[in-house]
Amino acid sequence: AFGNVEKMSENIEITPDYYDLDQIYERVDGLEKSSGGRAQVFVIGRSIEDREIKAVRISKNNSDADLPEILLAGTHHAREWISYEVPLSIAEFIVENMDSNPYVSDILERSVIWLVPVLNPDGYVYSRDQERYWRYNRRINPDMTVGVDLNRNYDSSWMQVEYVHGTGPFSEPETVAIRDLMKNSFEKPFENGIKSLDGLITYHSYGQMILYPPGSTNDPAEKSEYYNELASKMAELTFSECGSVYLVMQTSVLYLTFGEMT
């Protein structure tokens, strides 16, 4: 599939402007309207301030239970505005070209694409309206500080650091929304009942790096060679398209992280 992704990437454009949340969701809803139902929009949860968290499922049809399922997730961190734009622009390109572009068509013949462009809607709104470099959600913590880092609130090697990682794994409605999406929406069950996700990319800025797990230990992952090969190919394609050099490394080489989504 690398060749098809390479061909598809030649035509994706990123808008120079950043949209407010209502405009982002108008674009998300527009995917369903313009795709003949092949892009489906779901509200997978609500934020701490009761804003919708939306997901999009793009497929050739609605009965592709045996296909690999890939999730692209953006805006864990409020201030990283480009992280919603990349997956959303990818989704728009796929929908616009699913019938006319053979490379896009082939990808959808072999996979189902899920997207959550804005996992942290409250933080995103706050970063636009109040504090540009705000990172967290808008949880009022027991010590009256504000905000939990959503990408430290998963159950993968979770570690409490005051309240910035939450009071426990999945203490935040935003991460619960992703967890429940994985439990309830992906088609193929694991042995433990959790649904099978075949690939996951989370988008962040800044840094020009492609990181792969694990982040909580310096020991290599069981599939570290595969992860490195995949990440290196992504970096190669990025360089060939725009001349930007992206570093490839295991997350923990940069620094140790606990409770990350990946």
Label for each model-derived stretch:
Residues I82-S127:
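Short helix-loop-beta-strand segments that form the rim/entrance of peptidase-like active sites
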Residues N11-Y19, H76-R79, V161-G168, N218-P220:
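Second-shell loop/turn segments in exported
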Residues Q40-G45, E52-R57, E69-A73, R79-S83, ...:
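Structural recognition of the beta-strand scaffold that forms the well-ordered cores
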